Each structure stands twice: as C-alpha cells, then as structure tokens.
Swiss-Prot record:
One of its GO terms (cellular component) is chromosome. Effects nucleoid occlusion by binding relatively nonspecifically to DNA and preventing the assembly of the division machinery in the vicinity of the nucleoid, especially under conditions that disturb the cell cycle. It helps to coordinate cell division and chromosome segregation by preventing the formation of the Z ring through the nucleoid, which would cause chromosome breakage. One of its GO terms (biological process) is division septum assembly. It comes from Bacillus cereus (strain 03BB102). SMART domains: ParB. This is Nucleoid occlusion protein. SUPFAM superfamilies: ParB/Sulfiredoxin. It is found in: Cytoplasm, Nucleoid. Transmembrane segments: none annotated. Belongs to the ParB family. The keyword DNA-binding applies.
Length: 290
C-alpha cells in the first residue's frame, strides 16, 4: 500500500501529478512513519470514504477463523482524528473479523493523513483487491476524479487501466437506483447493466430489469430483448410520396371546388378519389333526379 500511496501522492517523484504541495521532505517522512499500537476496538470507526458498501458475512466469518488460527498477520491502518478516536484507512474486513472474534483491541498502524489522502488510500487499497462490485468500483473512480480534479484518461494512466474501462464503469452511475442496487446485490451482472444503458428511458430500463430477474435472462437474451425494444422505438418511415406537379395540384383543386359548388346547389353528388402510380382517378356520381 505504501508504494501505491507514494505513486499517487508524489512521494519521491517531484513530477507526479499528485505531488503534495508546500511540504518538506521531513514532513513527508513523518506522514509515512508507521507506528503499531494496540487500539481498543470501541475507539475505531469505519472509513467514511470506504467504497465497499456490501460485506459478505460468510467471507468475514472465514477471515475470522483464519485470524483465530494464525493471528492478525497484517495490522489494520488507521488515522487519529480526535483524542482516542481513530478512523480506518485500510483493513475494514480485518476489523470486522476481529470484532466478530470478540477482541477488545486490534493491532493498528497509525498514519498522519488528511481527508484527501485518507480517501485516496482507502479507494486505491480497495480497487487493488479487485473484490468490489462494479458499482462500488465506479463510485471509487468517480471519487478519485473529484478529489484530484482528473480526467478519465489521467486517472486511467495513474491506475494502469484502459480509459475505456474507466468510462464503462462510470456509465453505470447514470442508471436508475434500482438497477444499481441490483448490481450491488449481484442480482444482475455488470454486462446486464451495461446492456440496459442504450434504452435511455428509465421506465423501459426497469421493465427489462424485472424481466432479467424474473425470467433469469442471460446477457445474450437481454441484449436481444433490448435490441427489439430499440427497433420498436424507431420512428416509422412514411412511404415516399412522389412529387406532384403544380399543374396537377391546380387541376385537382379545381375539380374539388367544382364538385363543392354543385353540391352547394342542392344536388347530392358523390365522388371518390383514387391515386395510382401514373395518375389520379376521380369517380363522380350525379343522380338523374333531384
């Protein structure tokens, strides 16, 4: 984590985009100084910048059993924000496992970091573990972009990822809350969610989401369903009408006006117009007797 932190914040790299400003090397060295202490669990709070919103209870239980057998090999990382109050920077799963074991204290490395640094380290630490859901990962990318005023391309370079990877994840954040919740709960996959993006219409997106869950549609079936909906939504093309010459329009209007005059005189005139490729046909019926 130290290498990641150094790379992101410019420690030892003056050219880094993330270099901390107006700090001496002594101040930087002080920040990364590690001090391990046994801290009461009741004095520790989760990281407010934690991108992970879903913790697998079964995996926490497995981790707790491992810690019970082998001990906590890697201490959690915290920062002090008040007297005897600490916030987790990294290691919330280990913290939860220790709590489950009933420990009163937990070994912790104390770092002196500000809010921006704490958020960045927490986000990067979780991103590198590759255990986040697609939505949690997207939220982490968005927070890093906002914290450091980065473009998607710049963030991709810093994280060693493709720009398209970042862009595809961020698009998920535009989906309705119900779909994002389904992703978090793993009711649908990331590919299902991405397939819903072209629909645009939220009502349609939620309708297809319901179909995916209820009918257990795979990604291919989902894409086919969405393609059909998009096709149905396209405006129907009107049959191309052939251009009608001005003289023809005048002739047709003259006939219609004449028929109206006859009808106005009291005669019951019936007429029917038909259009063919090469001509118009008007059939007129005038009764012999009034």
């Amino acid at each position: 984590m130290k290498n990641t932190f150094s790379r992101l914040f410019g420690f030892g790299d003056k050219e880094s985009e993330f270099e901390l400003q107006d700090e001496s090397h002594e101040e930087i060295d002080k920040k990364v100084y590690e001090e391990i202490q046994e801290i009461p669990i009741v004095n520790i709070t989760p990281n407010r910048y934690q991108p992970r919103t879903v913790f697998d209870d079964a995996r926490i239980e497995e981790l707790a059993l491992t810690i019970r057998t082998h001990g906590l090999i890697q201490p959690i990382v915290v920062r002090q924000y008040e007297d005897d109050k600490y916030e987790i920077i990294a290691g919330e799963r280990r913290f939860r496992a220790a709590t489950k074991l009933g420990w009163e204290k937990v070994p912790a490395i104390i770092k002196n970091l500000n809010d921006t640094e704490t958020a960045s380290v927490a986000l990067i630490e979780n991103l590198q573990r590759e255990e986040l859901t697609a939505i949690e990962e997207a939220v982490a990318y968005q927070k890093l972009i906002e914290l450091h005023n980065l473009t998607q391309e710049a963030l991709a370079q810093r994280l060693g990822k493709g720009q398209s990877t970042i862009a595809n994840k961020l698009r998920l954040l535009k989906l309705p809350e119900e779909i994002k919740s389904a992703l978090l709960e793993k009711s649908i996959t990331e590919r299902h969610a991405r397939a819903l993006i072209p629909l645009k219409n939220e009502e349609l997106q939620l309708k297809v989401l319901q179909e995916i869950v209820e009918k257990q549609l795979n990604v291919k079936q989902t894409e086919e369903r969405i393609a059909k909906l998009l096709e149905e939504a396209k405006p129907k093309r009107k049959a191309k009408q052939k251009a009608v010459s001005r003289d023809t329009r005048i002739a047709m209007n003259t006939i219609r006006q004449s028929l109206q005059m006859v009808a106005d005189s009291g005669l019951n005139v019936n007429s029917e117009e038909e259009e063919f490729d090469e001509y118009y046909q008007i059939t007129i019926q005038i009764p012999k007797k009034k």
